[in-house]
Regions:
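Short, small-residue-biased leader/transition segments that mark boundaries at the very start
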Residues: 2-7
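ATP-dependent NMP and nucleoside kinases share a basic, alpha-helical "lid"
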Residues: 19-22, 26-31, 35-96
Length: 155
């Protein structure tokens, strides 16, 4: 039996801190292909629903608002341009000492979007009732404040 929890932006799996590992280039390169398998999606959706069964949870993912929690009180579809997402990822990886070109990141992000938008199981799409936030020109603080404001209105 596995246990997972998040504490202050860190992710733990069976008492092992795995935050950096799940954000590695290797995981990023393979996540779309793995998540396209029906058995993987079924198991993940069940686990995610179990984690959120009592409400009061903030969860992110490419199908959270359409598949995992289609009746969530607040759904936000957060996006940014491919260029900005690549720039942000580049800076994140640079801090970790990982080297990759900005152009390579743009290609990988575009390809992941294409794969996720066209997969048969749980495709990436905005829920009809989700609030669209384009964060291309926003700081992380501005994004957080915008989402918190929306959440307060939902209460």
């Amino acid at each position: 039996r596995q246990r997972q929890m998040c504490i202050r932006d860190r992710v733990y799996l069976n008492d092992h801190e795995v935050t950096d590992a799940i954000r590695s280039l290797e995981v990023s390169r393979n996540v779309s292909q793995v998540s396209a398998y029906g058995g993987v999606r079924t198991a993940m959706v069940a686990q995610q629903r179990k984690m959120g069964k009592n409400g009061g949870i903030v969860m992110d993912g490419r199908d959270i608002g359409t598949v995992v929690f289609p009746h969530a009180q607040l759904k936000v579809f957060l996006t940014a341009s491919v260029e900005e997402r690549a720039r942000r990822r580049f800076e994140e990886l640079k801090v970790k000492g990982e080297t990759v070109s900005l152009e390579d990141l743009k290609k990988r992000i575009s390809e992941r979007d294409r794969l996720d938008e066209t997969r048969a199981i749980s495709p990436l799409k905005k829920a009809n009732d989700a609030v669209l936030i384009d964060s291309t020109q926003m700081s992380i603080q501005e994004v957080a404040e915008t989402i918190l404001s929306l959440a307060k209105k939902e209460r």
